[in-house]
Amino acid sequence: MEKRILGLDPGLAILGFGAITCTPGLTQLQSTKVNVLDFGVIKTSADIEIGQRLCTLFDDLHTVIDQLQPDVVAIEKLFFYRMSSTIVVAQARGVVMLALAQHHLPYVEFTPAQIKLALTGYGNADKSEVQEAVARELDLAEIPRPDDAADALAVALTAWYQM
């Protein structure tokens, strides 16, 4: 049975999304087929008041969910680096959680180290190694752009590997 997984890389300025379809083989000898359904970003302008930016994320994420019809959503967990950046990302994550709740969608969360480990076998891999693994695993000619979309596909793949 096909499974649709939507990966999300939350952010206020740019929220990356990447959706994959996973179809298990009929027998143990047949491998799972994983395909890219869609990927991209939702952007908000720094010139707009933060409340309106959050509304834009919310509305646009609803549109993405309605179009892609995921079975499960995978989200990158919040990474603490600078307090001001962490607060802004936490606000965007709150909007994401609200949208998922309104769609009655189950979700899983992964730390950056878990994602790196799942895709490269090394929890301290750098961004380029993860992006190359995404392109290789999904049989893409190029690394998905922008980076936020590639990161979201990495989150979706991690969810698939954990199922």
Curated annotation (Swiss-Prot):
| Necessary cofactors | Mg(2+)
Listed InterPro entries: RNaseH-like_sf, RNaseH_sf, X-over_junc_endoDNase_Mg_BS, X-over_junc_endoDNase_RuvC
Broad class of the protein's primary localization = cytoplasm
Q: Does the keyword rRNA processing apply?
A: no
Q: Can you quote the record's cofactor note?
A: Binds 2 Mg(2+) ion per subunit.
Binding sites annotated in the UniProt record for Mg(2+) 1:
D9, D148
Q: Which residues bind Mg(2+) 2?
A: E76
Q: What is annotated as the active site?
A: D9, E76, D148
Entry's Gene Ontology molecular function annotations: crossover junction DNA endonuclease activity; DNA binding; magnesium ion binding
Tell me which PROSITE patterns the record gives: RUVC
DNA-binding as a keyword? yes
Transmembrane spans: none
**Which compartments is it annotated to reside in?**
Cytoplasm
Record keywords, A-Z = Cytoplasm, DNA damage, DNA recombination, DNA repair, DNA-binding, Endonuclease, Hydrolase, Magnesium, Metal-binding, Nuclease
EC id: 3.1.21.10
Report the catalytic activity. Answer: Endonucleolytic cleavage at a junction such as a reciprocal single-stranded crossover between two homologous DNA duplexes (Holliday junction)
A Gene Ontology annotation in the biological process aspect, one of them, is: DNA repair
What's an example GO cellular component term for this entry? Holliday junction resolvase complex
The family database entries (NCBIfam families) matched by this protein are listed as: PRK00039.2-1, ruvC
Quaternary structure and interacting proteins, as annotated = Homodimer which binds Holliday junction (HJ) DNA. The HJ becomes 2-fold symmetrical on binding to RuvC with unstacked arms; it has a different conformation from HJ DNA in complex with RuvA. In the full resolvosome a probable DNA-RuvA(4)-RuvB(12)-RuvC(2) complex forms which resolves the HJ.
Xref: PANTHER family:
CROSSOVER JUNCTION ENDODEOXYRIBONUCLEASE RUVC (PTHR30194:SF3)
Q: Which protein, by its recorded name, is this?
A: Crossover junction endodeoxyribonuclease RuvC
